[in-house]
Each structure stands twice: as C-alpha cells, then as structure tokens.
Amino acid sequence: TKMKKILLQTEVTKMLADTFTPVGIYLRLRDRFRDTILLESTDSHAAENSYSFIGVNAIGGIEISSLNEIEFKYPKQEPQKELIQKVQDAPDRIWAYMQQFEMQPSTQKEAIFAQGLYGYATYDAIPFFDTIEFKPGASVIPLMRYRLYQYVIAFNHFKDELYICEN
C-alpha cells in the first residue's frame, strides 16, 4: 500500500546573531526540549559552509540499534519497528522513509535547513553499506540515528545571522 505523503511547510525567521552563540542557545534548550542536538562548524572565517545547526524537538526519524531491526518515527504517531531481512536493504529503507515527506516550496532559501534529516552513522554501521562483516557485539548507542526536527536554528557565522526554521 502506498502511504500518503506527509506535507511539511517551513517558516523562517531571520535575526542578527552577533549576541548569540550556538553553544549558548543549545545549553538553554537541551533540557527543555527532547532530542536537541548541536552540530557546530569548525571554520567561522570561511564564507561558504560556515554554519552551525541546532535541531530542537524531533518530530520524525529513523533509528537502527542492531543489524536486524529498524525503527521509523512519524509526526504524531507511535514509532514503528520493522525487521531488516538483509543489511544491504537498510539504505533503501532510509531513502524510502525520506521520500514520504513532501516539502512545500518556500520563498526563503534557508528553509532547506529544516527540510532534511540530521543524525549520524557509527563505524559499526559499515555492514549496511559494504560487504564487510563485524563480529556481533553490544552497541551502547544506535548504529544509525537520523531525526527530522520541528525547529532548526541555523547560524551563518560569516554573516553573523541566525535563521529560526519551523516545520
């Protein structure tokens, strides 16, 4: 059965960032909102790609804690767990998940900052993408974890601007 697309519309507010730091805002938000993350830029002097991001309040996502199970999270729904038959199928399942979201076009190019998944894949997630096999072991963190956030705060360090993007 084909699932109905989940429509997302992103609103963007631009502010001067000269009195804010990504770490300062993150520290104020992390205990108030679940799943808050900070991805900080290392180069604040380069004009391109000099951004830091704070994701606040996950509304969807994917989590893989073992080589045989994947969990999908959708806005306002209970998480859904599914078995992974072959580890090489996981990237296609992640792609299929992402295709279930339809982003409404925005007049502000910065809306794209909130219209994707933020997360990570650990070293132990290599079997999902290659033929390498590892000895099974207990992982203390998920092998892969990606989230769609209700709010993404994007800092443009080069221009001293911040964008509050809301889905």
Placement of each model-derived feature along the sequence:
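Signature of the chorismate-utilizing enzyme
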Residues: 2-167
